[in-house]
């Protein structure tokens, strides 16, 4: 645990559409704190609606940081987010205030608490080289390369696991060290684990599924089509994270007149429900027992469960 880790932080995790943002705003008002984005898709600009970023009205209710600050033409790693959070927490005007981390990206929460190894960034040149080879040769061929260059980590990976195979090769070429060696290095915590209030929302599955459907229909009505049109106008690489946001492919198909409005909405809703299920499973299996589980944000404030850190 780092000696300068921030004490009395509030962490709010949970699947998409579970009510995290509303809870964070309520807590910010109660504590005088500020909200920090802990979601890997909400960092990207342009897609305000499809990534469910806080609305302008929400932003006016409390200070929000690290939302939409990354251009969609860029990639953004957990390590870069960690650096941005560290810089944010060091700002003079935020000292003594409660940071409220809210989002659905489990690795971000793990990094905050020091549970993620600090693997190095790799250059764009190295990254493009190995990703280009993966696209051209396939996962099985690159797994064979990894077996020769780093047999220990190759033995731990499935030959079909393209993402992890590429990552292992990138790190090996960039640093000369196996990813396994980097993973042994304990991460540095930005948030004090013992004093933090750790909350995970786990709403009723049927309720969440219905809310996801209503929310995507609202996104469509409020301008999701225009967002995707603006994104497509940038002519970006389809492999970029922003281009893989749920709804982009479906709305793009609608704009290309290869999919009806109804089918685009239905497929987006299904994809979002599947994503929420994966998030819930990750939080259930990966978060420690000291994370308190609630069905809703309202439940957090009932019965004196919420503790004002101030």
Curated annotation (Swiss-Prot):
**Reaction(s) catalysed (UniProt annotation):** adenosine(37) in tRNA + dimethylallyl diphosphate = N(6)-dimethylallyladenosine(37) in tRNA + diphosphate
Q: Does the keyword Transferase apply?
A: yes
Q: Which Pfam families does the record match to this protein?
A: IPPT (PF01715)
> Which InterPro entries does this UniProt record tie to the protein?
Dimethylallyltransferase, IPT, P-loop_NTPase
Q: Which GO terms describe its molecular function?
A: ATP binding; tRNA dimethylallyltransferase activity
What S-S linkages are listed for this chain? none
According to its UniProt record, the EC number is 2.5.1.75
* Residues binding ATP, per UniProt: 14-21
Give the UniProt record's GO annotations in the biological process aspect: tRNA modification
Question: What residues does substrate bind to?
Answer: 16-21
Residues under site feature: Interaction with substrate tRNA: 105, 127
Q: How does it assemble?
A: Monomer.
Purpose: Catalyzes the transfer of a dimethylallyl group onto the adenine at position 37 in tRNAs that read codons beginning with uridine, leading to the formation of N6-(dimethylallyl)adenosine (i(6)A).
The name under which this protein is listed is tRNA dimethylallyltransferase
Question: From which organism does this entry originate?
Answer: Brucella melitensis biotype 2 (strain ATCC 23457)
Q: Which gene encodes it?
A: miaA
């Amino acid at each position: 645990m780092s000696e300068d880790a921030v004490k009395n932080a509030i962490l709010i995790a949970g699947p998409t559409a579970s009510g995290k943002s509303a809870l964070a705003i309520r807590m910010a008002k109660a504590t005088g704190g500020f909200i920090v984005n802990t979601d890997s898709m909400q960092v990207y600009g342009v897609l305000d609606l499809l990534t469910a970023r806080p609305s302008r009205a929400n932003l006016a209710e409390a200070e929000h940081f690290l939302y939409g600050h990354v251009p969609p033409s860029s990639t953004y790693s957990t390590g870069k987010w960690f650096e941005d959070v560290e810089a944010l927490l060091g700002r003079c005007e935020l000292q003594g205030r409660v940071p409220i981390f809210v989002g659905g990206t489990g690795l971000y929460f793990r990094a905050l608490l020091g549970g993620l190894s600090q693997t190095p960034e790799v250059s764009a040149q190295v990254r493009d080289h190995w990703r280009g080879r993966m696209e051209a040769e396939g996962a099985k061929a690159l797994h064979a390369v990894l077996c020769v260059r780093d047999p220990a980590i190759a033995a731990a990976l499935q030959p079909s696991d393209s993402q992890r195979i590429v990552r292992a090769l990138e790190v090996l070429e960039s640093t000369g060290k196996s990813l396994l060696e980097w993973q042994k290095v304990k991460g540095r915590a930005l948030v004090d684990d013992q004093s933090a209030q750790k909350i995970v929302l786990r709403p009723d599955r049927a309720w969440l599924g219905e809310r996801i459907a209503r929310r995507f229909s609202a996104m469509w009505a409020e301008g999701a089509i225009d967002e995707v049109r603006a994104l497509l106008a940038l002519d970006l690489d389809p492999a970029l994270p922003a281009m893989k946001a749920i709804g982009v492919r479906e709305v793009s198909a609608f704009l290309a007149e290869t999919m009806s409005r109804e089918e685009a909405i239905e497929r987006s809703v299904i994809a979002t429900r599947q994503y929420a299920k994966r998030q819930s499973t990750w939080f259930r299996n990966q978060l420690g027992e000291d994370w308190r589980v609630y069905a809703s944000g309202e439940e957090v404030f009932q019965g004196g469960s919420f503790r004002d850190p101030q």
